[in-house]
Design a protein with these regions (language model features):
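Short polar catalytic/cofactor-binding loops
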Residues: 10-17
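Short beta-strand scaffold segments in enzyme catalytic cores
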Residues: 90-92, 104-108, 136, 202, ...
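C-terminal functional modules
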Residues: 279-283
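Residue-level detector of high-confidence beta-strand sites
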Residues: 105, 114-119, 137, 172, ...
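Cys-nucleophile CN-hydrolase/nitrilase-fold catalytic domain and related Cys-dependent amidase chemistry
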Residues: 20-111, 178-198
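Active-site catalytic loop in hydrolytic enzyme cores
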Residues: 95-169, 178-191, 261, 267-268, ...
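Extreme N-terminal starter segment of soluble prokaryotic enzymes
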Residues: 1-8
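CN hydrolase (nitrilase-like) catalytic-core segments centered on the catalytic cysteine
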Residues: 69, 73-87, 154-246
Length: 283
């Protein structure tokens, strides 16, 4: 696959829904609209499924959302989003594992194959969760992909782990309540595009709601490309305006042939091609 059309969607969690199924219908409609408009791969924001919280009667809202999504909605939702040659990163949702622990999990449909990615590094507000055990690399129609959830994109050790793994597309679902959070995610996503020589797509949660985690949200959709000669005449930074509400989309034509030609061309300063060196701290 030489080109991939990527749809990065914000999601306003404050838009009311009458039932859990109505909320899920809205999510599905956005994904299918993006597919119908030509997107191959769609990404939705972190914690968008916490929008189900108003339908949870039990005191522990996180576990309640986990049960509502995975037990009730997911068996009906999954078949609607399994489509050959199409993909979606369905935001994130609390997942209650057999060990009784909560994880912040991104459900991923890669054509007809299902996979997931758990968030690795947690904010102080995610004390009820445990971090995931590792990051998964996967291939979507021949494109080497990785999902890195919000704070994880800010961790340079993760970028070091991914060095040399052939990552072509990094996808970053995110949720933050401050402009500084938007800035941190954006600046670090841009850095990952340079360090790994790959394309990076980010999308944020928007809107206000009554929630233990996502009461206020701000953000945008953004895409970054490597700062290398092959991309000199290409847009290397695209973004929607920063917003506090509304559903917005950034559709990006990811030129993979250009990326692969760049990787095969020697003689240019490129941090993604430098081998890791053993270093020591001088004191």
């Amino acid at each position: 696959m030489d080109r991939l059309t990527l749809a990065l969607l914000t999601f306003d969690v404050g838009v009311p829904a009458s039932t859990p199924d109505a909320f899920a219908d809205r999510v599905c409609a956005q994904v299918r609209e993006a597919w119908d408009d030509g997107a191959d791969l769609v990404v939705l924001p972190e914690f968008l499924w916490m929008g189900l919280e108003p339908f949870v009667a039990e005191e522990d809202k996180l576990r309640g959302v986990a049960r509502l999504f995975w037990t009730d909605l997911w068996p009906r939702l999954a078949p609607r989003l399994a489509q050959a040659d199409k993909g979606v990163v369905l935001g994130t949702v609390p997942f209650l594992g057999p060990d009784g622990l909560l994880r912040n999990r991104a459900p991923i449909w890669d054509g007809l194959a299902f996979r997931h990615q758990d968030k690795l590094h947690l904010t102080p507000w995610e004390a009820a969760f445990v971090g995931g055990d590792g990051v998964g690399l996967w291939s979507f129609r021949g494109v080497r992909c990785v999902v890195v959830i919000c704070l994880d994109v800010e961790i340079p050790e993760l970028a070091s782990l991914l060095r040399g793994q052939g990552v072509e597309l990094m996808l970053v679902p995110s949720a933050t309540e401050t402009l500084l959070g938007v800035e941190r995610v954006g600046r670090c996503a841009d850095a990952r595009a340079v360090e790994l020589g790959c394309h990076v797509g980010v999308c944020h949660l928007l809107g206000r709601t009554t929630s233990v985690l996502i009461d206020e949200n701000v953000g945008r959709a953004a895409a970054f490309a490597p700062s290398q000669a092959a991309f000199r005449d290409e847009p290397r930074h695209l973004a929607t305006p920063v917003c506090t509400e509304g559903d917005h989309a950034l559709t990006v034509d990811v030129d993979l042939a250009l990326l692969r030609r760049h990787r095969a061309t020697p003689g240019e300063t490129d941090p993604s091609k430098l081998p890791a060196r053993p270093l020591r701290l001088l004191t």
